[in-house]
From Swiss-Prot:
Keywords: Cytoplasm, Hydrolase, RNA-binding, tRNA-binding
RNA-binding recorded as keyword: yes
Designated name of the protein: D-aminoacyl-tRNA deacylase
SUPFAM superfamilies documented for this protein: DTD-like (SSF69500)
GO cellular component: cytoplasm
């Protein structure tokens, strides 16, 4: 499971011209699901994101987590994160989960974050989406669990 995490002052996701998810201060999570991902990866990444200190304290140090700043999370599925880009000029997706498995893991991941008390908005799995964001910093982290 791959998560590309961006600290944002705001973010939204649009499908067919309609905003279906939006947040204020918080994190945008672009989530790529691999074939072998399961409950262990879901819990590991969900726990990591809830505890990860990527928000600034009063001294400007990255010392606060999402809960401590009252932030929100926007989760958007992005299968291109699992692409193999090592050979050739076209990405390969052999590591990626099937659409059925990917959607199930995506939904379980969102549920895991909500079960930890996080305010979570989402995109629409498998849809053609437009994602808007204001990256605060910029601050971006790549997690591979």
């Amino acid at each position: 499971m791959i998560g590309l995490i961006q600290r944002v002052s705001e973010a939204n996701v649009t499908v067919a011209g309609e905003v279906i998810g939006e947040i204020g201060k918080g994190m945008l999570v672009l989530l790529g699901v691999e074939k072998e991902d399961g409950d262990a990866e879901i819990e590991k990444l969900a726990n990591k994101l809830c505890r990860y200190r990527m928000f600034s304290d009063e001294d400007g140090k990255m010392n606060l987590n999402i809960e401590q700043v009252g932030g929100e999370i926007l989760v958007v599925s992005q299968f291109t994160l699992v692409a193999d880009t090592q050979k050739g000029n076209r990405p390969g997706f052999s590591r990626g989960a099937t659409p059925e498995h990917g959607e199930a893991i995506y939904k379980k991941f969102v549920h895991a974050l909500r079960a930890k008390g996080m305010a979570v908005s989402t995109g629409e799995f498998g849809a053609d989406m437009q994602v808007g964001l204001v990256n605060d910093g910029p601050v971006t982290f790549h997690f591979n669990v």
